[in-house]
Every structure is written in C-alpha cells, then in structure tokens.
C-alpha cells in the first residue's frame, strides 16, 4: 500500500456497527447527535495528527492511538461508544439540570471536540444550568479556533451544532 494513502471508513457503516455493540443502549446522546459528532470528526482507520497535532484514529479517538497501527471499523465503533460515554459521564458532573435533547447533543458534540474540562468550564454550561437554552446555544460559535487561529472546519461544525441546538431551545 502506498504510505501516502489514507485508509478511511464510512461513518454510516461504523455507526451501524456501533448500534450493535454493548454500551450503545447506555448512551444519552441521540442517534442524530452521534451523526453530528461523527460527520465532523470523520472516520479514519489509520492514525493521523489532527489540526491540534494530536494523534487520532477512528471517529475522533485520541485514546491509545499508536502511530502507524491500522484499526478495524469495529474497533472504531467501540472506541466511539466508549468516548461518547466518557464525555457524557464527565458532563453529568457539571450539568446540573435536565436538558432538552438537541441542546444536550450539541453540548456533547462540543465537549467531544474541545474536551470535557473546557466544556464544563464554559459559559454554555453556565447558561444550561440556568436553563437559558438559546443563550447556551449561541455560545457555540465562539469555539472556532485552534491554538488561537480561526478554523473554517470548526466554524462549519459549530454552525451545524448551533442549528441543531436551537431546535431544542
């Protein structure tokens, strides 16, 4: 295989596999929310360095990634479920109220992307805990920078998260 060839996977196929795995039924993120995350994370079976320089594989997985080691679609699906469950568990510690599904999905997508510590310390979570759903949603467009530099891909992602979030606000 050509070393410059990127081995990708189909997000839809990996999500279909994920739906059959243990842990899927424990997720609080909706199927649409999972698609939102997965569509912007993309899916790669070979590790790569993301815009922030972090080794990544599968659908946005940064845990236990071994540069040069190809994974399977089933491994990508399993790590995706594990990672979303981890994000949800961390958000449970800082989100103190019941949240409309679309707002929750958008928050999980943000936290999956920027980290749960950043999400939990955000104004978005502050507004969520005050049940100010629209105000919370409108915090999403602030998260469009990588190391201080505007990122058009993040801008697109946040616009889609905002649109989804507002449907529940």
Question: Where do the model's predicted regions map?
Answer:
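Short alpha-helical scaffolding segments that buttress acidic/His motifs in well-ordered protein cores
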Residues: 37, 103-112, 139-141
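Long, amphipathic alpha-helical surface segments
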Residues: 1-52, 61-65, 71-88, 96-98, ...
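A structure-centric signal for secondary-structure junctions around beta-strands
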Residues: 51-54, 104
């Amino acid at each position: 295989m050509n070393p410059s060839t990127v081995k990708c996977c189909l997000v839809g196929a990996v999500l279909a596999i994920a739906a059959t795995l243990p842990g899927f039924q424990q997720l609080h993120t909706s199927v649409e929310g999972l698609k939102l995350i997965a569509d912007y994370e993309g899916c790669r079976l070979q590790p790569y360095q993301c815009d922030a320089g972090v080794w990544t594989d599968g659908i946005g997985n940064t845990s236990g990634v071994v540069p040069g080691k190809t994974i399977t679609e089933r491994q990508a699906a399993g790590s995706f479920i594990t990672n979303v469950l981890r994000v949800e568990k961390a958000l449970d510690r800082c989100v103190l109220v019941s949240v409309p599904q679309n707002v929750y999905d958008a928050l999980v997508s943000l936290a999956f992307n920027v980290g749960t510590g950043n999400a939990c310390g955000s104004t978005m979570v502050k507004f969520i805990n005050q049940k100010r759903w629209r105000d919370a949603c409108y915090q999403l467009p602030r998260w469009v920078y990588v190391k201080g530099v505007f990122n058009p891909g993040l801008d697109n992602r946040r616009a889609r998260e905002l649109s989804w979030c507002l449907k529940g606000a």
